């Protein structure tokens, strides 16, 4: 039987790489994002590779109406899911104590509360007849000083704690719940691509001083590990865990 996965935030970056990785290994993929044109472009490309293997559902998961639309579309097309990847969040915001209360509340909503709401709704779509998985994409900023906005860091920390409790709550339903915390990842159009373009020298200096493996990570590496975590022989026994994919950055904080 073909397995089915929902990947939120999957029109670019880590989310897209994860969706492509699972699709290339025979999974049917539900793509989600807010850019209808990108969703159509990607789903059409994947369906050319394997017919009827990809859905593209435009939905802003901060909106209850869109969350319901996404849920109803999956139910009508597939019935159930075998895995959900929650790739939701934004690292925008003022650094340190310069952030306003409005920024703090907005970050908490985007990076934590909207994810919790989406997970509580969509976890009901997971198969009841066999083991299934939820993976949250977090950030090493949740417990490492990587100069991220405070609000982003503590929102991701809250997400890690939520995942631990959800892992306990869903354990009897054979649902594993884990968090993957990427470090500095180079993605097309992302912050590190921009910094590299602005000053390749400063970019290389940062990498050599802060990342022990002496290079920045790729979204494909995050996708590779995500797939392994879901499909590995020991995945049924891994739950409530958080795994850093950061080239050693989080243990090299000065």
Predicted regions and their residues:
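Conserved glycine-rich cofactor-binding loop
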Residues: 11-12
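Conserved mid-core segment of classical short-chain dehydrogenase/reductases
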Residues: 68, 89-105, 148-151, 191
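Short, small/polar-rich loop/turn modules that mediate ligand/substrate recognition or access, typified
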Residues: 171, 176, 237-239
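A glycine/serine/threonine-rich, flexible loop-to-helix segment
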Residues: 172, 185-210, 253-254
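Catalytic loop of short-chain dehydrogenase/reductase
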Residues: 133-172, 184-185
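Conserved glycine-rich Rossmann-like NAD(P)H-binding loop of the short-chain dehydrogenase/reductase
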Residues: 25-42
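Short C-terminal tail/terminal secondary-structure segment
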Residues: 233-254
């Amino acid at each position: 039987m073909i397995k089915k996965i929902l990947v939120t935030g999957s029109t670019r970056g880590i989310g897209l790489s994860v969706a492509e990785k699972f699709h290339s290994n025979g999974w049917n993929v539900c793509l989600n994002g807010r850019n209808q044109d990108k969703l159509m472009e990607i789903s059409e490309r994947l369906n050319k590779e394997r017919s009827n293997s990809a859905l593209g559902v435009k939905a802003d998961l901060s909106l209850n109406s869109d969350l319901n639309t996404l849920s109803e579309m999956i139910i009508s097309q597939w019935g159930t899911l075998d895995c959900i990847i929650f790739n939701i969040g934004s690292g925008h915001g003022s650094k340190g104590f310069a952030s306003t209360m409005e920024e703090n509340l907005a970050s908490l909503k985007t990076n934590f509360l909207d994810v919790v709401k989406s997970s509580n709704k969509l976890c009901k779509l997971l198969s009841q007849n066999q083991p299934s998985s939820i993976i949250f994409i977090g950030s090493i900023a949740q417990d490492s000083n990587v100069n991220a906005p405070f609000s982003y860091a503590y929102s991701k920390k809250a997400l890690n704690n939520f995942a631990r409790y959800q892992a306990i709550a869903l354990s009897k339903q054979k649902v594993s719940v884990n968090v993957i915390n990427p470090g500095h990842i180079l993605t097309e159009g992302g912050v590190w691509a921009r910094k590299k373009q602005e000053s390749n020298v400063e970019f290389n200096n940062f990498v050599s001083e802060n990342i022990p493996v002496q290079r920045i990570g790729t979204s494909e590496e995050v996708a590779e590990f995500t797939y392994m975590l879901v499909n590995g022989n020991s995945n049924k026994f891994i739950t409530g865990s958080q795994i850093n994919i950061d080239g050693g950055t989080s243990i090299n904080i000065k």
